[in-house]
């Protein structure tokens, strides 16, 4: 039986010349849930996610994924274990069609099996709602549809853990609603770590919320529990009426 938590960190710390970006962060990520990581600019979210994904090595502490200590593994090795991290750096090929972009991503695991490769590409396009745009050149997509395509590229790799970094940033209100529905659908098949500033999106999607403050873990719980936490209200959210 799989462990309840797909990922855990212990004492995770990152220092830059004596300045601590993260300090002794003990964090757990429940399997097949959406966990939101929130906090203001400078709270240490990007550094923490960098250490989880392998883009940044910790000064001390450990990261365990599926029970394996991956603290020293680079990002590409973590991808091979089942992590996908999107929106920080786009991997879209603008001159290729939507279908070709997804096919390239799916081919990282399925290039040896032509039928499975084609089936996976079609299934991903259907799941994320881009089947009717499969022949469209990526550079011609709207901003919102490009964001959806970026999700498709991660989904095509069958991630066990999908890290979504500010997926609703820059989207119109209607596009945000569509993204919320999409994330709920994704959570049926994978674990999601969501880095998000939009509190409405967090409230509508997250099963669990973790709050960072000045590099430390400040609070963790359901959205309602975090919202009611006076320290969180003071540090990030204002009064409950403003959330």
Where do the language-model regions lie?
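Glycine-rich phosphate-binding loops of nucleotide-dependent enzymes
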Residues: 2-243
């Amino acid at each position: 039986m799989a462990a309840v938590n797909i990922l855990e960190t212990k004492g995770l710390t990152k220092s830059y010349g004596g300045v601590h970006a993260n300090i002794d962060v003990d964090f757990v990520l429940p399997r097949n849930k959406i966990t939101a990581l929130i906090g203001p600019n400078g709270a240490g979210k990007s550094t923490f996610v960098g250490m989880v994904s392998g883009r940044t090595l910790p000064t001390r502490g450990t990261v365990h994924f599926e029970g394996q200590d991956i603290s020293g593994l680079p990002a590409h090795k973590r991808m091979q274990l089942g992590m996908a991290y999107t929106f920080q750096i786009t991997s879209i090929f603008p001159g290729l069609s939507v279908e070709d972009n997804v096919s390239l991503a799916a081919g990282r695991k399925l290039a040896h099996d032509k039928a499975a490769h084609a089936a996976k590409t079609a299934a991903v396009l259907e799941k994320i709602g881009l089947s009717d745009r499969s022949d469209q050149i990526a550079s011609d997509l709207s901003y919102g549809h490009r964001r959806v395509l970026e999700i498709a590229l991660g989904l095509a790799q069958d991630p066990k853990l999908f890290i979504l970094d500010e997926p609703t940033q820059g989207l119109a209100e209607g596009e945000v609603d569509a993204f919320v529905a999409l994330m709920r659908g994704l959570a049926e098949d994978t674990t999601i770590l969501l880095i998000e500033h939009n509190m409405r999106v967090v409230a509508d999607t997250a099963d669990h919320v973790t709050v960072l403050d000045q590099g430390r873990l400040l609070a963790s719980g359901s959205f309602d529990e975090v919202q009611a936490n006076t320290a969180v209200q003071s540090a990030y959210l204002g009064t409950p009426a403003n959330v």
